[in-house]
Amino acid sequence: MITCAPEQVQHSPLPPSSMTRMGTTRRRVLAVGVIGPGRVGSALLEQLRAAQPRLARDSALELKLCGVVASKRMWLDCDDAELNARHGGAQIWRPNDLDAFAGHVRGNDGRHALLIDCSANDEVAAHYPRWLAAGLHVVTPNKLAGSGPLPRWQAIRAACAGGARFRYEATVCAGLPVVQTLRDLLDTGDELFAVHGMFSGTLAWLCNRHDGRQPFSALVREAHALGYTEPDPRDDLSGLDVARKLVILAREAGWPLSLEDVDLEGLVPPALAALSRDDFMQRLDELDAPMAAKLAAARAEGGVLRHVAQLDRHGRASVRLQVLPAAHAFAHTRLTDNIVQFSTRRYCDNPLSVQGPGAGPEVTAAGVFTDLLRIAESLEARA
């Protein structure tokens, strides 16, 4: 089992001197542009700032922040060393223009350039094929590219044929090494039989806490107050976010899956799904009786309720609430843990498991940072 404790995933899993040990002694410069300075983007900017002296000293790597794009404005650097280290109030912002931003980061001097999209915006994801074809590397925790329309995903992969790299580890389970683990298994000739996982920290928390002592609606309200859910809890309860993550893994494994192909059973009935958010919150109690019945049925079988995503060797995918044996690994996770199990030819009797915190800006940003460093490892020093 690969287990990542919170304090572990906040740091890069690549040793500071890994690039130096591999023989790279010439200084390399990577121009970086960040789109979406929200919770994850801001955490990433701080991690980049804090790591820059160590990377320059131990790995001969300089990360040059060339700009930041917010929802309506963008900032472009002015080659000032201090301003280059972080974005802030001293800089001049201008109207948002993604094409101009990408062109600025890429420059015209043959530099290595990388765009990081932390926006969760479908319009931004639509630019990826063009950016990659132009030679810009792209790293993102944005699930809309990997789980969106299949033709766009295929265009993204085709655009990488020119040498640009596209990495998206943080789209599945934040900073946990899920996508890379699957990629490594397949690249070394293993055969994937099945994927099982709990991909939602919110739903894991609700299932772990739902023991009959409180109505399910009270737990949803508590999770909402704690910030565990999206502003509209139905975004979590629907299971759609989990389905997106499963589609991403399926495509990584070679199956041309779309969201419509996932057998998705959410926890919100159609009558409540059609309401406004405020009306839904007022009628949240209507979930109590069906969820209590599901809990009673699970206990009658000697099992527990867990929200599970699964993919079989034929590409069939499902996301639903399931009754699992009390001895099952998914029955013994920490409150908000994500866990993914890969059943393969090599890991058949005892699946390979990846488990740990699957949400939060710090761990998600660390997953993005790890992808950046993996790309940096492959770059040649340029004069």
Model-derived features with residue positions:
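N-terminal glycine-/serine-/threonine-rich beta1-alpha1-beta2 phosphate-ribose binding loop
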Residues: 2-6, 15-133
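NAD(P)-dependent dehydrogenase/reductase Rossmann-like domain
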Residues: 21-33, 39, 47, 64, ...
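Short glycine/serine/threonine-rich phosphate/pyrophosphate-binding segments
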Residues: 42-43, 122-126, 141, 148-150, ...
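Glycine-rich phosphate-binding loop of nucleotide-binding enzymes
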Residues: 118, 138-141
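Rossmann-fold NAD(P)-binding glycine/threonine-rich loop
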Residues: 122-130, 143-168
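Anion (oxyanion) recognition and catalysis
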Residues: 132, 160-161, 224, 299
